[in-house]
Amino acid sequence: MVSLFDKLNAKKDGRDGSVSKELLSHSVAHTKNRLPKSGRRTSERSLAASVKDGSCSNSKSNKRNSSASVSGEEDKSCLISLNCLCCGVPLRFPASITKFRCSACQVTVIVKEPEINSNLESSTHISCTLEGLQMVVRRCHDDLQRLKKTGILDKERKGLIFQPVITYLLDRFHDVSILNRSFLVHDGGKNIKMLNYEVLQRFYSILSNLPTRKPYYSMLCCCNDLLKRITINKGENLQILQYRWLLIILNIPTIRTCLIRDRKSKNVFETQQIRAVSYELAKRCIGYLSNLSTKTSQQLIQSLRRTPTDNFSYQVEILNLYINFQFSRLLSNELSNRTAKNNVKPEDEMRSRLRRHHTTGHEFLSTRPISAQSNDKQGSGFTHPVNNKMKFKFFQYEEDWHIHSAAKLTFIYYVANTRRNGRGALSIQSFYNITLDFIDYKQDFDHWRGVAQKTKMNQLIEEWGNSTTKKCFSFCKYPFILSLGIKISIMEYEIRRIMEHEAEQAFLISLDKGKSVDVYFKIKVRRDVISHDSLRCIKEHQGDLLKSLRIEFVNEPGIDAGGLRKEWFFLLTKSLFNPMNGLFIYIKESSRSWFAIDPPNFDKSKGKNSQLELYYLFGVVMGLAIFNSTILDLQFPKALYKKLCSEPLSFEDYSELFPETSRNLIKMLNYTEDNFEDVFSLTFETTYRNNNWILNDSKSSKEYVTVELCENGRNVPITQSNKHEFVMKWVEFYLEKSIEPQYNKFVSGFKRVFAECNSIKLFNSEELERLVCGDEEQTKFDFKSLRSVTKYVGGFSDDSRAVCWFWEIIESWDYPLQKKLLQFVTASDRIPATGISTIPFKISLLGSHDSDDLPLAHTCFNEICLWNYSSKKKLELKLLWAINESEGYGFR
């Protein structure tokens, strides 16, 4: 048998002057990084009918299993309607067609009869393995070393030496079934086949470190042919039923790098051809995965929720980079037209805009440092238009199937992430895409809200003709991609419109009835009975809740431009959480508050309570705080916000609220000995401390109350078989059943405020908590960021002596003092959810001379007023007096 090494030596000796050129058996149809034209001539292998929006063209194939030609007299009743498996575009074609091509994404679909006797044992055992590749590569390296010793090594011979690697890859990557059997590992005995991502990464790493690019490029081209010509069985409802092969292709390393334009990269595997083919793989993998059937999508979700965190995060990042890439193309085209006259390169203009964006205090809009920030460093070609005129309009992406498919697939990953309990779930920030901060969110939101409120007539018009129609797209349908900053902007936009509408209606009513109708929702309260006065005003003005809020404190000067409103929220929540009210209990072990199980004077049989209306008041207050962009000082667990967002609760939520009890429950669950009942001796009951007994020390009530968790629970012992059910009912009792009347009253007040506000649906529980409570800092505030956005009034500047002293003093203070200062200036010791750099902070000069007076604060405008004090020590002393001895509007 003649080896490859002998053949190469034979060429040197002149015995065999021919060198095989069959290095690639598969070719890529499109190697330029652009969309293929719909009218482009197909290759001989993909002659098919081009189908789009119900139009078909007759074609013939030169293959043995040729597609049936379509007669122009085909009965229209035999037409099949479906969405493209890759791009989702609606298609209609005759049932007799066995091969068709979508002219939008250029994918050819071959429909074949299912194989009845498919017992091809020789092929069912073939799979792509790391060991197989290592063996082939090792032999090729041995041949390479021997060839180096002969001194006849050149580029062409080096490529021929690694021809066995190319053959191995083409044999494995040409078939979907082979790829689906490759790189598998079983997950914990649950009979779920998972991809072994560690092995897969090592597999690609070997290919990336070969001395030639040809094997890697051959694999890419083979994958591209596989994705461009998909074969499905007739009995599968024309759907893709397998997904693992798509994940294998999606994890090819150059798919990520092709979405980042790094012009300084010296990697030999980042050539233009490799980047172009890698992009083709990216867009079709994302397209196929986003259009899987419901059943297959559920299987994909089950697989993703068990995927290692690093690999899961990597795939989410690819989706965000892909969206960035699509918007960069939109922006590049626009900037090319704008900069042509000025002879400025679009890439330079975009990078300039990106640098300006990252120096204007808007870093909070995205917390994804990898995909968002690395793009700038590596020259991704995308920048963010800081000019309001430079917004992505809705029509630019409304019909873009690339963006649609990426958003749909990101939704699948988001759902999988919510189910990754104990498996390293990503935070919501990992799904944020900073690019979307620069869409025209008003158009997008109006379109989304318009679709949600579409009339029956419009629906009938769309369905006329009984044709397959595409669903309307809007990024508001995928809110997890939108950053918290743009969601807040959307909410402020809707709230502003609602308030303007309410004010307009009040004005029209006043004209119609000839009497004065207030355009504001005014609340007049006394500090000592703030809860009673607030509840009375809210009850008397139920129809005014959506108007702009104005607060007035009795016998106190002050016009509410925002500061009085903050003060009212702060004092009212403090009053509602007063332990003597008995509305909420404070749990020391978790430092969290929760609804009291037995509020004072609560009659369970009638569901009435003299103080139950205060829960309604608290719900209204929380809603008004969001509605009026005010932060509340609350210490609720995540369970409350999950309940508000209709998200399922878990044992982890109970653990956050009652950590000590949850540890004991876990110990019970982990106990597996046979003497379980003798050791624990428990029944389906729970005992809690009576809140009324704590408040009133009443002899008529018991200190502890025992409740059955199920029917006849006192006689149902806890065993090894039902201990999980016991824990489930225990958690359900404390988080739901025991507080149901109180919570229902609270949520009715909350929903009363947001009855007409759709934007609240954009927030999940994590974001809602930040929206209500702000961004909680653990140790110190970032006053350097605040200083960078501070404005100076009255003669002060950033380098003024008193100003420099001020910043030095507050940065040296401990956290409690910093909170007091923030409370003094802004009427809240919390910073906004979007970060401290978004506070419109001001420092103004009261007088150019020294003074013994204390500093002043205008909480309506987040402004502190300083005298030009003579020394740093004096300034610090005056600040301490001001923040510790002030309350209300006037010193006491």
Curated annotation (Swiss-Prot):
PROSITE patterns referenced in this protein's UniProt entry, alphabetically: HECT
Catalytic activity: S-ubiquitinyl-[E2 ubiquitin-conjugating enzyme]-L-cysteine + [acceptor protein]-L-lysine = [E2 ubiquitin-conjugating enzyme]-L-cysteine + N(6)-ubiquitinyl-[acceptor protein]-L-lysine
InterPro entries for this protein: E3A/B/C-like, HECT_dom, Hect_E3_ubiquitin_ligase
Family matches, as SMART domains: HECTc (SM00119)
Keyword terms: Nucleus, Transferase, Ubl conjugation pathway
Molecular function terms, GO-annotated: ubiquitin protein ligase activity; ubiquitin-protein transferase activity
The protein's Enzyme Commission number: 2.3.2.26
GO biological process, one term: protein polyubiquitination
Family annotation (Pfam families): HECT
Major site of localization recorded for this protein: nucleus
Gene3D superfamilies, A to Z: Hect, E3 ligase catalytic domain (3.30.2410.10), Hect, E3 ligase catalytic domains (3.90.1750.10)
Residues of the HECT domain: 792-892
Disulfide bridge positions per record: none
Main EC class the enzyme belongs to: transferase
Family that this chain belongs to: Belongs to the HUL4 family.
Identification of the protein by name: Probable E3 ubiquitin-protein ligase HUL4
Species name: Saccharomyces cerevisiae (strain ATCC 204508 / S288c)
